[in-house]
C-alpha cells in the first residue's frame, strides 16, 4: 500500500507516553516514504511493520524527535536525512537489512541522536560493530538498549582514531558499502549511469520486483511514462504495480 495523503490523513495521531505528538503508520506494507508534507508537524512517527527499503524522502521536519522503523526492509539511510530531521533523538531500526558498517556513516551526522537501536540487522554481526557506531556517534548514550560506557568510547578511539585522522582500519571500513541506490547522491552523478536500468541495478529489490520493473520500462510507450518511472526510482520508491501480486493474494 502506498503512503498516500489519504492514508496519512486517516491515521491515528495522539500523544505518546513521552508527551510527543505521534502519528501511527504501522503495518500497512508501505514500500516507500512519501507525501509526509501533508502529515503536519509531529514529534514522532511510527513506521513499524512495513516494507520500507530506503529511510529518507522526508520534508524539512525540525520537530521530529523519534522515528520507529522496526521490522521493515531498510538497507540504506538517505544521505540527506540528517538535514531534514536535525533534531532526531531516538531512532529504532531493529530487524532491517542494513549490511555494512560503512552504511551507518550517515548516523554520525545527527547531532542530537542519543538512543539508537540496530538489533537484528546483518551489520550487528560485523567485527567491532558496537565500537564503530560509538566512534561515528559519540553523542549516543544508549545503543541497542544498553547504556554506553566511557571505556567503550575510549576503545573506539583506539581502534578508529579521530574524524580528522582515522586509522587504517577506519579507512578500510569506510570503503566497504552495500551496493544500494543512493537517492541523495543521484542528482550529483550527472547523466552517466542515471537511467532507469542503472538505478534498477542499485535499488535493493527482490527478483520478482526487478522483473516487473524491467517489464514496465520495456512497455513504457511515452516520454511521460518514462519520466514517471524515473521519478519514482530517484525518490527511492517502487512505482505502482511492482509489488508482487502473489504477495497480495497471500494476504487475502
From Swiss-Prot:
Xref: InterPro entries: Leu-rich_rpt, LRR_dom_sf, RU2A
GO molecular function, one term: U2 snRNA binding
GO cellular component, one term: post-mRNA release spliceosomal complex
UniProt keyword list: Leucine-rich repeat, mRNA processing, mRNA splicing, Nucleus, Repeat, Spliceosome
Top-level taxonomic group: Eukaryota
The protein's assembly and partners: Associated with the spliceosome.
Family that this chain belongs to: Belongs to the U2 small nuclear ribonucleoprotein A family.
Function per UniProt: Involved in pre-mRNA splicing.
Protein name in the entry: U2 small nuclear ribonucleoprotein A'
Name of the encoding gene: lea-1
Amino acid at each position: 500500500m502506498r503512503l498516500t495523503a489519504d492514508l496519512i490523513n486517516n491515521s491515528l495521531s495522539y500523544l505518546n507516553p513521552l508527551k510527543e505528538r505521534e502519528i501511527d503508520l504501522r503495518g500497512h506494507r508501505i514500500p516507500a516514504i512519501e507525501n509526509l508534507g501533508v502529515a503536519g508537524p509531529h514529534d514522532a512517527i511510527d513506521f513499524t511493520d512495513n516494507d520500507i527499503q530506503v529511510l529518507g524522502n522526508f520534508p524539512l521536519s525540525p520537530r521530529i524527535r523519534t522515528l520507529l522503523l522496526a521490522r521493515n526492509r531498510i538497507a540504506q539511510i538517505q544521505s540527506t536525512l540528517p538535514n531534514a530531521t536535525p533534531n532526531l533523538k531516538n531512532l529504532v531500526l531493529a530487524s532491517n537489512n542494513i549490511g555494512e558498517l560503512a552504511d551507518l556513516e550517515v548516523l554520525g551526522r545527527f547531532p542530537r541522536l542519543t538512543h539508537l537501536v540496530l538489533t537484528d540487522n546483518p551489520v550487528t554481526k560485523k567485527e567491532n560493530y558496537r565500537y564503530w557506531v560509538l566512534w561515528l556517534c559519540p553523542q549516543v548514550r544508549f545503543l541497542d538498549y544498553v547504556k554506553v560506557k566511557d571505556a567503550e568510547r575510549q576503545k573506539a578511539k583506539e581502534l578508529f582514531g579521530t574524524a580528522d585522522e582515522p586509522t587504517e582500519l577506519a579507512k578500510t571500513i569506510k570503503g566497504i558499502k552495500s551496493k544500494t541506490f543512493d537517492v541523495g547522491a543521484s542528482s550529483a552523478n550527472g547523466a552517466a549511469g542515471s537511467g532507469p536500468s542503472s538505478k534498477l541495478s542499485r535499488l535493493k529489490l527482490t527478483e520478482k520486483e526487478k522483473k516487473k520493473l524491467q517489464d514496465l520500462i520495456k512497455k513504457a510507450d511515452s516520454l511521460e511514462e518514462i519520466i514517471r518511472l524515473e521519478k519514482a526510482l530517484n525518490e527511492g520508491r517502487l512505482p505502482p504495480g511492482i509489488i508482487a501480486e502473489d504477495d497480495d493474494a497471500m494476504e487475502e
